Amino acid sequence: MARWNVCSYCGREFEPGTGKMFVRNDGRVLFFCSSKCEKLYFMGRNPRKLKWTKAFQEARLQRAKRRK
């Protein structure tokens, strides 16, 4: 079975054959699950500030642990 890809922006897993793969000039490969993630990445938006991304959810858990 093929390995699932992980979106470079939101952190969501998605099936191979879907989404987009972008290769930067330095050789780094970025996977995007949707055009929404792709556009937000190229616009320079920080995924830690958007509630629906995995990066935001992980940052929120870390903040909650620090408060205790």
UniProtKB/Swiss-Prot annotation:
Q: Name one GO biological process term.
A: translation
Name the encoding gene, please. Answer: rpl24e
Q: What function is annotated for this protein?
A: Binds to the 23S rRNA.
Looking at the keywords, is Zinc-finger present?
A: yes
Residue ranges covered by zinc fingers (C4-type):
7-37
SMART domains the UniProt entry points to: TRASH (SM00746)
Residues reported in the UniProt entry to bind Zn(2+): 7, 10, 33, 37
Q: What is this protein called?
A: Large ribosomal subunit protein eL24
Superkingdom assignment? Archaea
UniProt xrefs under InterPro entries? L24e/L24_sf, Ribosomal_eL24, Ribosomal_eL24-rel_arc, Ribosomal_eL24-rel_N, Ribosomal_eL24_CS, TRASH_dom
The protein's UniProt keywords, in alphabetical order, are: Metal-binding, Ribonucleoprotein, Ribosomal protein, RNA-binding, rRNA-binding, Zinc, Zinc-finger
What is a single molecular function from GO for this protein? zinc ion binding
Looking up PANTHER family in the UniProt record yields:
60S RIBOSOMAL PROTEIN L24 (PTHR10792), RIBOSOMAL PROTEIN L24 (PTHR10792:SF1)
